[in-house]
């Protein structure tokens, strides 16, 4: 590169103040100079000056610099290149490039000019290492090969490290191309280091596609990474591509063939054929086709699974043919597990191991094992068997003489990989002897034998530890360890002592080394019977007197095997008194009882057992026992399988204690078994196979002093208490109206099955077949329960019962073992006569008292009751006030018919005077003009009868005041004439002033004889308001009845009230009194007549 520079400096005279006046002139001169210089440079270039200097390096030693020649330069032009400040700094070249040694860091000035060409300018350049590019030479591939069985490409090239001045890091980039279109399938980098000399590098790559399937090409380039070089660093050019050469086989079309791959891998299969492939499948699965060059196709399988032992088929189908291969998918060998090496006989080492995870590969692809020993350098190969025992393999390695330490390495290998496991052992500490054989037993004496056996192996250099197992019947096994020196002939002998005479023993043997690694397996059992000896003890003896007290029965127990020391043949029983001994005949072995007829003297009884060797020591017992007056019977309960008896320590007991027991329900003599306990004991557990739950047993504790036994305690008890099996039998002794007396009997001991704790008595009301006491323990309130814990009580009186009532009674006994069954009955209490009498008298007395009180009250209030509920009702037949004159009903046009109106009940009050006014029965209706006797108003109010009456609903009518003034001796006053439409009653003042409001039903009214105009007008005014009018126009009446009354003055116009005429039928409502008709006697009885007073009838 050429740099053109121009340096301008101010002259000193331009600095002072005088120079400022020259500034403008100097600037013009400077610009003129620059312009001339630039024109000269342009003219020079046009004439052929070199330009664009560039330098590169391939090895950091030499820089290759080049420039562009001018267009005017011709052939044969020679350039001179000079570098300042360097010796031999000028170089000549006929080309436009030259190589110069690498320059030091910094700027360097380089000039280039053409020689022999006058007038040409010189080109100057500034060159720095930063402007130099480091571009390595293009690498060269020395060799490219392929392993088609594994689809692996092997690349080899030279790094040319000798051209570099020092150690550098070189980065290689390798590309793999596939198929005819040069598709890049892999681009990787590979780092190496050059150190000043040429080195050949190797690199391998495994293709995911078989190399036979398509063309594979490889190219390489490099990049030098020198940290000290400050210039630009660039990649070299790619090397020429090299291809993998493969010659097609006419037989094989599918690749890879018989491939073994790892489970879970991805694999590609291809079919190389000129035919068109229609489909492809692996196993039973169809796969999509991948098209390659020509008609070649491929399929890719992802995450392939384990194949069968025979492999998995891969098939390509064309129109005419089927091509295929087999693939085997499995695992690499697992690390051998549980590797163990030991010896049985110190002659041969056996190593065993577990292969671990199955590889799923069989046949030639199966795992092979090799056992290598590093100290000796020997190895053995595993010979495969079809079915290894217990999934464990083993190899045998012959021991080397005088070698005890072995270092084994077990190698495992199959087509998918390899693994190994190592073990270091001292073989003398890893001895696992074989099973001892040929066991023999010989007698030494009755308590010792000699054992011999055979143990294969050469154990002369070590000691053996053997264990002897000794078993005998009904005894805990015994293990004895013995240490013996190993021998070469494998025969061993050991004495076993401390045995029991006449005892069957079973012997077994196993062995190991003294350092112990493993016991051998147990040998076969060897049974042996030791010889007999004299019995070591006399029989266990007891005596009982017969029930009549005349004979003494001697009992003894058979000697146990460890005391009999042989087969007992017979027993000898003798008795002595005052040093006189009487011996009985020998008693054969099966019999263990003898009966002696003795008096009440204290004899010493001796019993001796005999076997084939001799007699046992005698067992002695006194015939009489020491009496004990202070003896109480106690109770005890066992623990399920036995019963615990305790007592206080007694130093006077010199020999031992004897506990005997029997079933309490059996007859005398009571003896089931006995047990002797040392004299220093204070308790004993009595156990027997004959004990049964719920059975009462008697236990007797005897203490021995001065060769005599004394009964110390008498105990009855149960091994386990149960509930009674029967209910107590009870009866009713007496019944009354309020109580029941029951009585029951004891339950037999055999059926009680425990200690009786009490009775539960239940009772409730209930009839037979209807009352069932359920859930007696549930606490029902209607069931009464009595718990009887006094066992001496045999009767119970149930009080506070109801008479003539049925009761359900239930009785149950209970023990600590549970509740027994129930016994029930129904009882009816007697009738309570006193209660019945009281029940009758109380209601009668109450009724009498209520009647008397009611009578007194009614008598005192009789008038009020009569007036209130039953007032006197006048007899219409005896009423003369209603008899009118005939003229009243004849031809009087003023009379009018009555009108029917709704009727509501009303009350009619009839006032009677006691003296002045005649009785209503004898009074006749008189004319209004007749003179009426005076009557007192007080008398009118004193005595009146209220009669129920039902008039029609009427309009009220004010009575004529004149009528009141002309009142006669008798009058009828109508009160409380109520209408359903009538307003509430008004005060008397309002009624007197209101003529309409006081009108009601008034059949009789007193009117004046001569009617005035005012009266008529008032009457007309009251027509609408007046109520019931029994008299209308008299002249219009049609008298049908011959007995109808008529007015004597038919011409006089009067208004009649209380008409006897019917409204509709115009019949007289109240017929006149007929003298001829029979009188009503009023003899008919009614409840109302009971309260009425009729003195005049």
Swiss-Prot record:
Q: Which N-terminal stretch is annotated as signal sequence?
A: 1-44
Q: Where is this region: Disordered?
A: 982-1005, 1022-1097
What stretch of residues is annotated with the motif Box 1 motif? 869-877
Q: From what superkingdom does this record's organism come?
A: Eukaryota
Task: Tell me which UniProt keywords the record has, alphabetically.
Answer: Cell membrane, Disulfide bond, Glycoprotein, Membrane, Phosphoprotein, Receptor, Repeat, Signal, Transmembrane, Transmembrane helix
* Gene Ontology CC terms, in alphabetical order: plasma membrane
The answer on whether this UniProt entry bears the keyword Ribosomal protein reads no
Sequence intervals crossing the membrane: 834-854
The record's annotation in SMART domains points to: FN3
Task: Give the Cytoplasmic membrane side ranges.
Answer: 855-1097
Q: Where is this motif: WSXWS motif?
A: 519-523
Q: Which residues carry this modification: Phosphoserine?
A: 927, 1044
Record: glycosylation sites: 85, 131, 143, 191, 243, 303, 366, 390, 407, 426, 445, 471, 481, 489, 572, 652, 663, 680, 729, 787
| Cellular localization per UniProt | Cell membrane
List the Extracellular topological domains: 45-833
SUPFAM superfamilies per record: Fibronectin type III (SSF49265)
| Topology relative to the membrane | Single-pass type I membrane protein
Gene3D superfamilies the record matches? Immunoglobulins
Q: Where is the composition biased (Polar residues)?
A: 1032-1067, 1086-1097
Q: Return one GO MF term.
A: cytokine receptor activity
Q: Which residues form the Fibronectin type-III domain?
A: 46-131, 332-434, 435-534, 538-629, 627-719, 724-833
Q: Which family does it belong to?
A: Belongs to the type I cytokine receptor family. Type 2 subfamily.
Please report the name of this protein according to its UniProt entry.
Leukemia inhibitory factor receptor
Organism source for this protein? Canis lupus familiaris (Dog)
């Amino acid at each position: 590169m050429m740099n053109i520079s121009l340096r301008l400096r101010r002259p000193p005279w331009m600095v002072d103040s005088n120079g400022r006046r020259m500034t403008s002139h100097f600037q013009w001169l400077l610009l003129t100079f620059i312009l001339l210089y630039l024109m000269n440079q342009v003219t020079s270039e046009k004439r052929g000056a070199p330009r664009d200097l560039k330098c590169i390096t391939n090895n950091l030693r030499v820089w290759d610099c080049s420039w562009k020649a001018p267009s005017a330069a011709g052939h044969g032009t020679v350039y001179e290149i000079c570098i300042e400040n360097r010796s031999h700094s000028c170089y000549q070249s006929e080309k436009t490039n030259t190589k110069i040694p690498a320059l030091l860091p910094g700027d360097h000035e380089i000039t280039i000019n053409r020689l022999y060409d006058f007038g040409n300018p010189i080109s100057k350049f500034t060159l720095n290492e930063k402007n130099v590019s480091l571009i390595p030479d293009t690498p060269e591939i020395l060799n490219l090969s392929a392993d088609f069985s594994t689809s692996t490409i092997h690349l080899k090239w030279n790094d040319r490290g000798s051209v570099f001045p020092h150690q550098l890091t070189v980065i290689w980039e390798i590309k793999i191309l596939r198929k005819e279109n040069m598709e890049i399938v892999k681009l990787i980098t590979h780092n190496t280091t050059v150190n000043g000399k040429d080195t050949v590098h190797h690199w391998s790559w495994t293709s995911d596609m078989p190399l036979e399937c398509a063309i594979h090409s490889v190219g390489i380039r490099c990049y030098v990474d020198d940290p000290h070089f400050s210039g630009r660093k660039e990649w070299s050019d790619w090397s020429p591509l090299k291809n993998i050469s493969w010659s097609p086989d006419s037989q094989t079309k599918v690749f890879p063939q018989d491939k073994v791959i790892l489970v879970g891998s991805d694999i590609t299969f291809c079919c190389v054929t000129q035919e068109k492939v229609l489909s492809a499948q692996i196993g039973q699965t169809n796969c999509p086709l991948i098209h390659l060059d020509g008609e070649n196709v491929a399929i890719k399988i992802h995450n392939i699974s384990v194949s069968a032992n025979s492999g998995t088929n891969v098939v390509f189908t064309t129109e005419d043919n089927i091509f295929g291969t087999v693939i085997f998918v499995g695992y690499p060998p697992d690390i051998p597990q549980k590797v163990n090496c030991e010896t049985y006989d110190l002659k041969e080492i056996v190593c065993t191991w577990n292969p671990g995870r199955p590889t799923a590969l069989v046949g030639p692809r199966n795992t092979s094992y090799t056992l290598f020993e590093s100290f000796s350098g020997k190895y053995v190969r595993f010979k495969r068997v079809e079915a290894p025992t217990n999934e464990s393999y083993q190899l045998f390695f012959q021991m080397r003489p005088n070698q005890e330490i072995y270092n084994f390495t077990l190698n495992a290998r199959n087509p998918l990989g390899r693994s190994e496991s190592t073990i270091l052992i001292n073989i003398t500490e890893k001895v696992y002897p074989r099973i001892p054989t040929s066991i023999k037993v010989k007698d030494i004496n009755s308590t010792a034998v000699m054992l011999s056996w055979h143990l294969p192996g050469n154990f002369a250099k070590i000691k053996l530890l053997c264990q002897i197992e000794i078993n005998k019947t009904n005894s805990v096994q015994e293990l004895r360890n013995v240490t013996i020196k190993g021998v070469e002939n494998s025969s061993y002998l050991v004495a076993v002592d401390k045995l029991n005479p006449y005892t069957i023993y079973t012997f077994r043997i196993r062995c190991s080394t003294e350092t112990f690694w493993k016991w051998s397996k147990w040998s076969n059992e060897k049974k042996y019977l030791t010889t007999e000896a004299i019995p070591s003890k006399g029989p266990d003896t007891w005596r009982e007197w017969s029930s009549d007290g005349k004979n003494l029965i001697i009992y003894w127990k058979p000697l146990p095997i460890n005391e009999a020391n042989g087969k007992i043949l017979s027993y000898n029983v003798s008795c002595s008194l005052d040093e006189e001994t009487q011996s009985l005949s020998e008693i054969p072995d099966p019999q263990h009882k003898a009966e002696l007829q003795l008096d009440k003297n204290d004899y010493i009884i001796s019993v001796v057992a005999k076997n084939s060797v001799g007699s046992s020591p005698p067992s002695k017992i006194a015939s009489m026992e020491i009496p004990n007056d202070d003896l109480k019977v106690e109770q005890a309960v066992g623990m399920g399988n036995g019963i615990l008896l305790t007592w206080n320590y007694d130093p006077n007991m010199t020999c031992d204690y004897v506990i005997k027991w029997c079933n309490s329900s059996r007859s005398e003599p009571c003896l089931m078994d006995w047990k002797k306990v040392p004299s220093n004991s204070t308790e004993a557990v009595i156990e027997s196979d004959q004990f049964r739950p719920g059975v009462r047993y008697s236990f007797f504790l005897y203490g021995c002093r001065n060769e005599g036994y004394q009964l110390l305690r008498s105990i009855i008890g149960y091994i386990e208490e149960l509930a009674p099996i029967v209910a107590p039998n009870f009866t009713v002794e007496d019944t009354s109206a309020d109580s029941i007396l029951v009585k029951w009997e004891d339950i037999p001991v055999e059926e009680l099955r425990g200690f009786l704790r009490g009775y539960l008595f239940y009772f409730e009301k209930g009839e037979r077949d209807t009352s069932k006491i359920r859930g007696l323990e549930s606490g029902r309130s209607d069931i009464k329960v009595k718990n009887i814990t006094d066992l001496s009580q045999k009767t119970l009186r149930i009080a506070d019962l109801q008479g003539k009532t049925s009761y359900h009674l239930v009785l149950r006994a209970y023990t600590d073992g549970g509740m027994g069954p129930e016994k029930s009955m129904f009882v009816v209490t007697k009738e309570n006569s006193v209660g019945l009498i009281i029940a009758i008298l109380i209601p009668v007395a109450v009724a009498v008292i209520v009647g008397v009180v009611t009578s007194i009250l009614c008598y005192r209030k009789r008038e009020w009751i009569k007036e209130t509920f039953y007032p006197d009702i006048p007899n219409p037949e005896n009423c003369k006030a209603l008899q009118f004159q005939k003229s009243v009903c004849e031809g009087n046009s003023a009379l009018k018919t009555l009108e029917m109106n709704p009727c509501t009940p009303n009350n009619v009050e009839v006032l009677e005077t006691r003296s002045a006014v005649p009785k209503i029965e004898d009074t006749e209706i008189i004319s209004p003009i007749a003179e009426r006797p005076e009557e007192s108003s007080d008398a009118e109010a004193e005595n009146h009868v209220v009669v129920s009456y039902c008039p029609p609903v009427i309009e009220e009518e004010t009575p004529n005041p004149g009528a009141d003034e002309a009142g006669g001796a008798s009058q009828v006053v109508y009160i409380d004439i109520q209408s359903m439409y009538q307003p509430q009653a008004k005060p008397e003042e309002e009624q007197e002033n209101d003529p309409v409001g006081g009108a009601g039903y008034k059949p009789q009214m007193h009117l004046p004889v001569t009617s005035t105009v005012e009266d008529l007008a008032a009457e007309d005014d009251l027509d609408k308001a007046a109520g019931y009018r029994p008299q209308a126009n008299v002249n219009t009446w049609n008298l049908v009845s011959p007995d109808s009354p008529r007015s004597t003055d038919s011409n006089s116009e009067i208004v009649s009230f209380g008409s006897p005429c019917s409204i509709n039928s115009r019949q007289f409502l109240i017929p006149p009194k007929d003298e001829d008709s029979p009188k009503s006697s009023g003899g008919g009885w009614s409840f109302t007549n009971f309260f009425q007073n009729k003195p005049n009838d």
